[in-house]
Amino acid sequence: MKKRRILAVIGMMLFVVSGVFSQELNCNVEINSDKISGTDKGIFTTLQTAITEYMNNTQWGNAQFLANERIECKMFFTISSFDGTTMAGDLQVQSTRPVYNSTYTTTLINFKDSNVEFTYQENEPLVFSENSMESNLTAILNFYAYMILALDFDSFSPNGGQMYYDKAENVVTMAQSSGEKGWKAFEDNKNRSAVLSAFTDNSTKGIRTLLYDYHRKGLDEMVLSPDKGKAVITKSLAVLKQIYDVSPMSVALSMFKDAKLDELVNVYSKSNLTEKQSVYELLYPLYPTERERLDKIKEESTNK
């Protein structure tokens, strides 16, 4: 055992020296400026490159990632207005996580931020700082980088993402004093402050337990034992009802829906009628506008 531990330390040192360890994110960034006319589009290309490099070259924490372990994520900016200095629009943030012992990847975040506004000058450097708000753009990028990491770590170990929620909270605290849109508490139940609160407030942070049970004890287990893994997923969904009962407008509920609803249809496609009905009856009161998608759970049972 001692020899093995020494060899592990030597291996770790070799990884560090050879530069095998990498930053945490592998983020694909796209900027759509189709709504903007009469402007040199070069600035959007420059911005896209700058954000890509910022997201992928920043060290967001102290975790060590191998190059092939980087978290796959995407950021889609749709710019709806630009006055030469200030851009406004929305941002779709997505992240995925691999499922153990399979080639399947599962979505963790699929969230649309509809209140994105920032100033940017072409070739302006994006400067990272943990202790100050360099710009609203970098604050937005920092916030979502930390949330991507927080949810990813939560999905692998109970409350494993706490360090990144703390970092995201620091970003929100600094940004709230700036007067910029999208940060103020109670301003909007789907803004960045609300997103953070959904995962940290005592009344709704059960969503973090759901993340771990659903992914690590559910999906990861399904590859080897489908019935056992699915049973854990079914049990974990009860957290959604608990959140709904105390905070029916919590963004945690819509974030789970947007990331997981289609996946749940597939998970239960081969379930027995009783299990399908149980899941349907739990989810439908929470997501009544999603009846068409939810009905597919029951439709499969009639076609078996």
Predicted regions and their residues:
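Sec-exported extracytoplasmic/periplasmic mature domains
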Residues: 52-60, 150-154, 265, 269
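Flexible, glycine-rich surface segments
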Residues: 160-253
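A cross-kingdom marker for long, charged
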Residues: 30, 218-304
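Acidic/His-rich structured neighborhood in mature extracellular/periplasmic domains
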Residues: 85-197
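Start-of-domain marker
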Residues: 23-88, 99-101
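Bacterial Sec-dependent N-terminal signal peptides
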Residues: 1-25
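Second-shell loop/turn segments in exported
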Residues: 34-41, 127-135, 245-246
